[in-house]
Amino acid sequence: MKKLAIAIGAPALILSGAAQADTVVGLYAGAQVWDTSNSGQFGTGNGNQSFAFTDEKQTSFYIAVEHPIPFLPNIKIRENELVSYGATTLTQDFNFNAQVYSANSSITSYVDLSHTDFTLYYELFDNDLIAFDLGMKGKKVDGWLAIREGINENGIRSDGWIPTGYAHLRLGIPGTYLTFYGIANAISVDDSSVHDFEVGAEYRLVDSIALDLNLQIGYRDIKIELDDLDGVYSDLKFKGPYLGLEVHF
C-alpha cells in the first residue's frame, strides 16, 4: 500500500493508561442494511472518469468483545459490503488499465470496495449517560474496479490495508431507553484520504440480565479518495441511511 500510514491513533495508546475496562466480558453482535447513494470517479493514473452510479442496498455485520483486563484493548471486527455499478458516454478518450476507450463510447463500470474493519480501542468513559471509545482501525480492502464495454471487462484489483483513527461517542437520555451516538474513522496522508462517519439513534427493545437488544437508525458517509493505491486513483462517495439491530450479551 502506497502513501498510506497511520496518522491517527496514537492518542489511544497515550491515553490507554487511563482507559476504563469492563467489569465483565461483554459480547456485541450487530447487522445493518444501508441504503447508499453513490457518486464519484476513478481511474488508473491517466485521468479519472465520472460515472452515474446506481444506488444500492449494502449490508454490514460486526462483532465486538469488551473485557476487564487493564491495558489490553477491546476488539471489534466489522464486515462491510461496498458495491456499485455505473454508466457513462465518454466525451473524450479514457485510458484505463492500459486500454483506451474512445470518445462517444458507452461504457459501464463495476466498483467493489468491500472491506473488513479490525478495530482496537479503549473505553475512556463507560456509563449510562456517556461512553467514549478511542483507538485505531485497519481497513482490509479487497477491491475490484472494472470497465465494461459490450461483453469485454477490463479490471484491476486493489488489495491492502488502510489504517485510520477511531472514535465512538454515545450519549444516553436519562429515564429513557434512547441513546444517540457518533462514530468517526479518518485519515489523510499526502493526496489520499479516507473517512467513514456515522451518526444515529439507538432504542433498547429488550433490557434484561441475559441480553440487551437494540434497534439502530442512522446515517453513514464513506469517502475514499486514493492517489496510487496499487495503481488506482479514486474519488468515490457512498452515503445514506441505515437500519440495524444489535444484541449485547
Which residues does each predicted region cover?
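Residues on the lipid-exposed face of transmembrane beta-strands in outer-membrane beta-barrel proteins
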Residues: 31, 61-67, 118-122, 136-138, ...
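Short glycine/proline- and aromatic-enriched beta-strand/turn motifs that initiate or cap beta-hairpins
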Residues: 20-83
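Transmembrane beta-strands of outer-membrane beta-barrel pores
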Residues: 31-37, 79-85, 124, 138-144, ...
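Membrane-embedded beta-strand positions of outer-membrane beta-barrel proteins
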Residues: 27-31, 63, 75-79, 120, ...
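Residues that define the transmembrane beta-barrel architecture of outer-membrane proteins
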Residues: 23-25, 55-61, 112-116, 130, ...
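Outer-membrane beta-barrel translocator/channel fold
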Residues: 210-249
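Flexible, solvent-exposed loop segments that connect beta-strands
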Residues: 37-52, 85-111, 141-158, 190, ...
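Short loop/turn motifs that connect adjacent beta-strands in outer-membrane beta-barrel proteins
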Residues: 19-25, 68-74, 125-132, 174-178, ...
